[in-house]
Amino acid sequence: MSTAAPNETTQPTVQSGQKRVGVLLVNLGTPDTADAPGVRVYLKEFLSDARVIEDQGLVWKVVLNGIILRSRPRTKALDYQKIWNNEKNESPLKTITRSQSDKLAAALSDRDHVVVDWAMRYGNPSIKSGIDALIAEGCDRILAVPLYPQYSASTSATVCDEVFRVLARLRAQPTLRVTPPYYEDEAYIEALAVSIETHLATLPFKPELIVASFHGMPKSYVDKGDPYQEHCIATTEALRRRLGVDASKLLLTFQSRFGNDEWLQPYTDKTMERLAKEGVRRIAVVTPGFAADCLETLEEIAQENAEIFKHNGGEQFSAIPCLNDSEPGMDVIRTLVLRELQGWI
């Protein structure tokens, strides 16, 4: 009779020597290739997650497999091709997240028992591969770092779900910690403010206002108790205080809505149209909910929403880069990680 644990996988081979502490940076994910087949694989994994689309019933499966995965990969592949890192043949999100991991490892290099790696919730490198690699390096403690400032079940929680699924298949599990959301952390707000001020100083025009655009979500998710909207509001209010502006000069909007349900409002694209029609001619957009530039910032904001604004009468538009692997951005990640590693290092 087998004595293996249910669904147990082979335990990663562990190097001998001092036990180490692992740090795993995790972002959302990206297709492996900027073509329809690659996008289809990515979208199927992403949209099959019940944390993302809560109703995974028969109707949704028919819609997903019979409609969405037949048409959407072609159009989204064209969007990815606009921003693709052709030199490395990967998305900017993958390039930046790798660099964040490398820079964090360098910052912690004086602690030789700390190992840093990175993973994506959907696509590659997977969370499983990241955890396996850390265990193979001798890590008996792992800090998972979801790179989402504002908590949502559809982002932070699904990272935890996947980490737990991976650990559930191991007989010898490492001790686990997860960094909390950091939507009003002082280091995060300061880094955002510095990035905005630095970027605005490089522009040949002065924006009449700034739009803070966050990824949207169905309103029903918030109605059921998701704190995401509350966190986005808190971030925006903290940023207004730090910049010394009021709500008329730093607007809060939500982007990337999908499907026919009502999502959190005001919508970013509709706001771009309205502002231009009301006579606003110069704006800048910051995306505080994204730790790294990706399709939603580089294509949807910097290209699509810029076009909407200018088509309706706007003249000058600037997308402020995410914190990425900049010095202020790395200060945020390093601060979060060192805080949560207390007692381990």
From Swiss-Prot:
Which reaction equations make up its catalytic activity? heme b + 2 H(+) = protoporphyrin IX + Fe(2+)
Question: What is the protein name stated in its UniProt record?
Answer: Ferrochelatase
Gene for this chain:
hemH
Matching entries from CDD domains are given as: Ferrochelatase_C, Ferrochelatase_N
Which pathway, per its entry? Porphyrin-containing compound metabolism; protoheme biosynthesis; protoheme from protoporphyrin-IX: step 1/1
GO CC annotation, single:
cytoplasm
Location of the protein in the cell: Cytoplasm
Report the source organism.
Bradyrhizobium diazoefficiens (strain JCM 10833 / BCRC 13528 / IAM 13628 / NBRC 14792 / USDA 110)
**NCBIfam families, A to Z:** hemH (TIGR00109)
